[in-house]
Structures are given as structure tokens and as C-alpha cells.
Amino acid sequence: MDNPERCPWCGDDPLYVHYHDTVWGRPEYDDLALFEKLCLDGQQAGLSWITILRKQENYRAAYDHFNPEKIVHYDDARVEALLNNPGIIRNRLKVQSIIKNARGYLDLRDRGIGFSDFLWSFVNHQPIQNHSLFTPCCRPPAW
């Protein structure tokens, strides 16, 4: 892309720019890609998205490339190993949330519901187009 228009939040970090230009704002329909996104979004709680992006490959390695069939069988020893992995966020609740997400993913599948179909059903299977202008976090005082 030659001089694409970018949102101010991505700044000039090459990883963030790549994410902005190739991932952000593009509809995703693949069940496993959406499962990974759900898990990574949960890891972001209280942190910046760039923090998670910088650790994304570490997460893929640590969580068997977000394979719910494998994650659902993680035992206490595996949880402890994850909590000692310096390449990911080492928070017990966040680790456990990925395991619970895997259970939910497989439960939907076992009921014949695709994860993508489940998520997209909340927006009538259509992306929401938000054309509003950037709104600053602070408003100037009224005159």
C-alpha cells in the first residue's frame, strides 16, 4: 500500500501498521481464526493491543496454535507451565479463560453450531460499517 489512510491509533510501529493495513476492520469468517481472536482479545484486558500483538507468535506456540481440541485437555501441570512462560501474559485467570473458551467452542461445535455462524448471528451475518469520524476522548468545555 502506498501512503494508505490510517487511523491515528496505529502510530508508526511496523507491527501495528501491518495489523492495521491487513487485519483490522476486515471481516473474518474462519472458525479457528475467530477463536484465536477471541482468546487474544481476552488477554488484552487491562493492556494495550500492541502488547498482545507483540506476543501473538508466543501465544500460538504456547497454546498449540489455538487448537481447541488440544487446549480443552490442558491439566494443572500445563496451566503451571503457561504461568511460567515469559512469552505470554502470566495471569491465571487469563490462562483459564482460554481453556474455558475452548470448552465453549467445542460445545457449540458438538451442537452443530459453527463458531463463525454463532458470532456473526449477533449482527445478522453482516459487518457493521461505522462511518463516524474519530471522536477524541475528551471534549472541550462548553462555551
Task: Name each region found by the language model.
Residues 1-143:
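HhH-family (HhH-GPD) DNA N-glycosylase catalytic core used in base-excision repair
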